[in-house]
Amino acid sequence: MEPRAGVSKQDIREQIWDYMESQNLADFPRPVHHRIPNFKGASRAAEHFPRLQAFKMARTIKVNPDAPQKNARFFVLESKKTLLVPTPRLRTGLFNKITPPPGATKDILRKCATSQGVRNYSTPVGLDSKVLVDLVVVGSVAVSEKGWRIGKGEGYADLEYAMMVSMGAVSQGTPVVTIVHDCQVVDIPEALLEDHDLTVDYILTPTRVITTGCERPKPAGIAWSKISCEMLGKMPILRSLRHQEEQAGKDVTLRDGPRSPPGATRSPRDLAPPELGSVPLSSVQIGNLPRDARVSELKRALSALGVAPSRLTWQGPQHGAFLHYRDPAEAQQAIACLQGFRLGANTVRVVLARQQRASDLVGSHTAEPLPDHQPAIAGP
């Protein structure tokens, strides 16, 4: 199956999706349209993965969270290597580190490799973690033997890689692997490729291992001119990276936003915490923290999510905390980012607390009650 002449990326996607469904090559979840398609034989294709020399040499491996890469995630855990999985749509950070329970059996490791396991056994990895990724696995809708790749059209794999470059986690020499059905290996016109498109070095199918020898440069960092204000608003970690690059004097002009002049920085006054007694803060109340949670652990997680507060009031005995932000907009953004947030095995409860003056921070807090059937967090 080869794409017809004069096609677009979307034409190729639709052709692959339609073919996999019509030939019953697709596996759950179906239909595969608008997804990284799962396929019959995905586990067979993944069996090539631990045989790659790049896998044997790697210590830390990033694998996408899609269904056809489930066995690849299992092989990473079974080999006692560090497994990093991107957070869905990058809404709450970039990576989660999957940490199986002590003494985990193969059955438990297989559960850890599922989407549910990724949620239950993960901890956020922040921008300041200095992580080095030795091998990258991405999903694809279509890929060519030359190593040119087409994703599902949302650009997350390209952006994930670019963000890893920006934080120093990968380099041009970091190998990239994709796992696909044989029918997904097609000719892709080079004219369709853009500078921000990620290429691959190895293609694993149920019947073949293809070494692409691709020499086209991989993305050298985030192409800010391709990023919209809307996308930036949904991804706190992207905002953090943009601020870092802005501080370094790089051009971080967005596709649809005003230009930030190179070298522009916030004034010390902008960065300073509010003075006590003068500026009201917006507070977020969180509860259902694990009994053994530590304040340092929570601070690291919040930083990784890009929602570090101006001040944090710890309420360990009540398994909760107050997060104090500079304004209501920051507080609402934090609440949005913390929906479904897990610390350890617990899903954290989040609610907007009654706005307090900064001077209240030296005394006790009186927060609005949590929603019905949720235990309130008492003030100190």
From Swiss-Prot:
Keywords, comma-separated and alphabetical: RNA-binding
UniProt xrefs under SUPFAM superfamilies: NagB/RpiA/CoA transferase-like (SSF100950), RNA-binding domain, RBD (SSF54928)
Entry GO CC: cytoplasm
Pfam families linked: 5-FTHF_cyc-lig, RRM_1
Domain RRM: 282-355
Residue ranges of the region described as Disordered: 245-283, 361-380
GO molecular function: RNA binding
Name recorded for this polypeptide: Methenyltetrahydrofolate synthase domain-containing protein
Organism of this sequence: Bos taurus (Bovine)
Name of the gene this protein is made from: MTHFSD
